[in-house]
A protein has these predicted regions:
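Membrane-proximal basic amphipathic "stem/tether" segments
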Residues: 227-272
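Short acidic, S/G/P-rich loop/turn micro-motifs used as interaction or catalytic elements
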Residues: 16, 102-108, 135-144, 174-175
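Long acidic/polar interaction regions in large eukaryotic complex-forming proteins
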Residues: 64-115
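Structural alpha-beta junctions
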Residues: 28, 146-173, 185-190
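Well-ordered, non-membrane alpha-helical segments in soluble/globular domains
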Residues: 105-117, 141-157, 210-215
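Polybasic, proline/glycine-rich intrinsically disordered low-complexity segments
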Residues: 167-233
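Adenosine ribonucleotide-centric catalytic and binding domains
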Residues: 8-81
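Short loop/turn segments at strand-loop or loop-helix junctions that form parts
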Residues: 12-14, 85-96, 129-137, 171-172
Length: 272
């Protein structure tokens, strides 16, 4: 039987945690740690979960300061890379390539203000919360269990009476493909091991097979609907706009027709 939570969100170490949760249908809004991560292998990065916990418990007070950022150059995803020296976190998905740091920084602050406020409000409205960590498949790294205990203790005390559980997804290449091992470490901490390397030709070794990680979560956990009616309507409108844009459609009937034509081998515009 699936274990149901009021809120599920990822705490790294990379964006693959958020991707797995979203694909599993367990997260529908954006949170502050979805698309930022540590610089793996750098001094102090291995206590990443502790630092993120401290930021949440401080309610993100003064966490984004311009003097803490260092430009690292352009990223292959079309964004500029910036490293936050104090937080030991790298921002790979925010700054438009070639943009002025000073010019874009207020936009960054406002975006993360919304995400931080949203997360804190949802935590306060929730009784049972699940934190997900998805380790990178190419690194022999395991989130220290003492860091998990620290996170549960600090968050539970700060947001009492909310209950926080942690699930750790770890890539174990000694397991057969499709084999899954669940290890309840202690009350509130669960380790799930499987081989979730992405074996597609040319795949990025840092990225897991998101299909495997998302199915693993979806089969074990569920989440109640925590969005307001306004947020649901806005999300549906956004998804609808994406679908229409894909086929150059301006209304539902045009979208259905062009999608059908594309499926039949046409060019999606109604012309074979």
């Amino acid at each position: 039987m699936k274990k149901k939570y009021d809120l599920i969100f990822g705490l790294g170490p990379a964006c693959s945690a958020s991707q797995a949760i979203r694909r599993a249908g367990l997260q529908s809004l954006s949170f502050p740690f979805d698309w930022i991560g540590p610089t793996f292998g750098q001094p102090g990065w291995d206590h990443d979960l502790q630092r993120r916990t401290n930021l949440i418990c401080s309610e993100f007070k003064d966490w984004l300061r311009p003097e803490d950022f260092t430009f690292l150059g352009p990223h292959t995803n079309g964004k500029d890379k910036y490293y936050n020296n104090r937080l030991k976190l790298i921002f790979l998905h925010d700054f438009p390539v070639g943009s002025s740091f000073q010019g874009y920084f207020p936009t960054l602050v406002e975006k993360y203000r919304r995400r931080c406020t949203r997360l804190l409000e949802l935590i306060r409205r929730s009784k049972k919360i699940l934190i997900v960590r998805v380790e990178r498949p190419d690194l022999d790294y395991r989130t220290p269990l003492d860091d998990c205990r620290y996170a549960r203790k600090c968050l539970s005390e700060h947001f009492a009476p909310a209950q926080f559980d942690i699930v750790l997804l770890q890539c174990d290449t000694s397991l057969k493909r499709g084999e899954i091992r669940e290890e309840p470490i202690e009350d509130g901490i669960l380790r799930i091991s499987l081989d979730y390397r992405n074996l597609e030709p040319g795949a990025d070794i840092m990225q897991p097979d998101h299909g495997l990680t998302s199915v693993t979560l979806r089969e074990r956990f569920s989440v109640r609907e925590y969005r307001t009616q306004e947020e649901i309507a806005a999300w549906k409108a956004k998804q609808r706009a994406k679908r229409y844009a894909r086929y150059g459609a301006s209304n539902f009937l045009q979208y259905r027709w062009r999608k059908l034509m594309a499926a039949l081998g046409g060019n999606g515009t109604g012309n074979a």
